[in-house]
Amino acid sequence: RCLECHVTYAGISSAPGVEPEEYHHDQIIFGVDCEKCHGPAADHVAFHTENTRDTMAKYIINSSSLSRQQNLDMCVLCHGGNIQKTKPSFTYTPGRSLADYFKIDTLSMVAVQNENIDVHGNQYGLLRSSKCFKQSTTMTCNTCHNPHEKERGKTAIFSQRCMSCHTPGHDNFCKLKLSLTQLSKNCIDCHMPARKSMAVAVSLPGEEVPRAAFVRSHFISIYPDETKKMIENINK
């Protein structure tokens, strides 16, 4: 499972059904590349190399042509919590139903307040239990995340995406008595606070004991303690 999420593709050398799987070291696409979300691209490249004037993308997956669940499945592959594969690694491709390749742990996607649910790797389960997701018929991971841009830490950008639904003057807008300028810069620290992961720790230079990694909770909610800290920081 580590490889399936941290590389785009690896050719399996072991026989079907044999665990642990072994891989061809010369058949690995390192990192998360285009094919992770757009599917195998050899035919796409071959066609457009020969047909340079054809601007309509052929033989490639475009997320705009997929259903909501198909779009979500691409992310659930690596952000869906404790999903167990039922078919060999790297056989799922975008556009297919993830449930045909994995047993999805739906139980962990319900009791999100349970402290045993880790923020690392279970972003879909947490998001799926949030009111924002439940009350929308179109919300996907791409509603908030642009997979083609590096946006980590840019809270103002994410906050603007929150406010595309939570608009000033509506009942679902922030009730804090702060200026619109202050509110529009950081919805994230209040409603998606960073939480310690119980699954992932990092070793820092000069420290003997690893520290828990902090990951933003994707259970979008009201966190009174985080709101209090936010107001205190603004008033400093």
Annotate each predicted stretch with a short phrase.
Residues 9-236:
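Primarily the internal scaffold of c-type cytochrome electron-transfer domains
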